[in-house]
Amino acid sequence: MEQYTANSNSSTEQIVVQAGQIQQQQQGGVTAVQLQTEAQVASASGQQVQTLQVVQGQPLMVQVSGGQLITSTGQPIMVQAVPGGQGQTIMQVPVSGTQGLQQIQLVPPGQIQIQGGQAVQVQGQQGQTQQIIIQQPQTAVTAGQTQTQQQIAVQGQQVAQTAEGQTIVYQPVNADGTILQQVTVPVSGMITIPAASLAGAQIVQTGANTNTTSSGQGTVTVTLPVAGNVVNSGGMVMMVPGAGSVPAIQRIPLPGAEMLEEEPLYVNAKQYHRILKRRQARAKLEAEGKIPKERRKYLHESRHRHAMARKRGEGGRFFSPKEKDSPHMQDPNQADEEAMTQIIRVS
């Protein structure tokens, strides 16, 4: 066992190397560094920087006091822990394959800023541990220049928003690792909702181009149009959970301007064009505010009662006095009764 002691102005550090493991202890704070193979360690307590060199292909685990865990596989790593105001901690880690440093800034109460995909465990206000898992695609490197990196800002421990406009809504997990509810909204406008969370609830999505599909894993995917205003659309899709795990989808057409008023029946082309002109004139007067938009059911109550009492034929047409007196327009029941009377008389 070999022991090395280095004296500095601020504190005394002791590095113990035994069986390929290195442990470093400092006064006032504990920093444990564990290696599986031999490595060279350079420590500077004034700046609190630990530089570790590891053989290619060997795993490295650096555990910093405060519950943070950083892992790397076979790459030189430099961890710089700088304490800030109000208990803030800033750590810099080199990104594999690039020349820049990856900076992680932790703000304990509720705001977290992360660049890159990491798994961070934070302590909630009620004492429950919350786990945030953020994944990003592999960063492309061209001519030594890294493409735009994903920046994620979590505020209030409820919503995570990236630089590309992607919004991630997360909720705390239980002790056994089960997620209560997970909703992912990518940039393409696709929403994935677990089918189990739809029990006893109704989800209404507006939009004429709304597409809803269900997969075999018990999830429901709703695709919404990205561009355009989906509020002023011509349709509404309602998902109502049924007896099974897959909710039923119902499309309800919204009434337009032409569906509010009933089309008159049995009119010729001249009458129809005249009706269209009257509707345009009425719409113009309603827009100017000269006439009310609400129309009364009838103009005179006496005429309405008289029209409702009149007999109507096929298609709702009224019988004229001439048609009513004609023999071929008589009631078929009355004609049958007269025929039976004639048969009885003949017999």
Swiss-Prot record:
One of its GO terms (molecular function) is DNA-binding transcription factor activity, RNA polymerase II-specific. The modification Phosphoserine is found at residue 326. Residues 311-328 have a biased composition (Basic and acidic residues). The keyword Hydrolase does not apply. Residues 299-310 have a biased composition (Basic residues). Pfam families: CBFB_NFYA. InterPro entries: CCAAT-binding_factor_CS, NFYA. A motif (Subunit association domain (SAD)) lies at residues 266-289. GO terms for cellular component: CCAAT-binding factor complex; chromatin; nucleoplasm; nucleus; protein-DNA complex; RNA polymerase II transcription regulator complex. Keywords: Activator, Biological rhythms, DNA-binding, Nucleus, Phosphoprotein, Transcription, Transcription regulation. It comes from the Eukaryota. The keyword Transcription applies. Gene3D superfamilies: 6.10.250.2430. Disulfide bonds: none annotated. It is found in: Nucleus. Residues 299-347 are annotated as: Disordered. One of its GO terms (biological process) is regulation of transcription by RNA polymerase II. Residues 296-321 bind DNA. PANTHER family: TRANSCRIPTION FACTOR NF-Y ALPHA-RELATED. Heterotrimeric transcription factor composed of three components, NF-YA, NF-YB and NF-YC. NF-YB and NF-YC must interact and dimerize for NF-YA association and DNA binding. Interacts with SP1; the interaction is inhibited by glycosylation of SP1. Interacts with ZHX1. Interacts (via N-terminus) with ZHX2 (via homeobox domain). Interacts with ZFX3. Component of the sequence-specific heterotrimeric transcription factor (NF-Y) which specifically recognizes a 5'-CCAAT-3' box motif found in the promoters of its target genes. NF-Y can function as both an activator and a repressor, depending on its interacting cofactors. NF-YA positively regulates the transcription of the core clock component BMAL1. Belongs to the NFYA/HAP2 subunit family. This is Nuclear transcription factor Y subunit alpha. The lineage of its organism: Eukaryota, Metazoa, Chordata, Craniata, Vertebrata. The gene is NFYA.
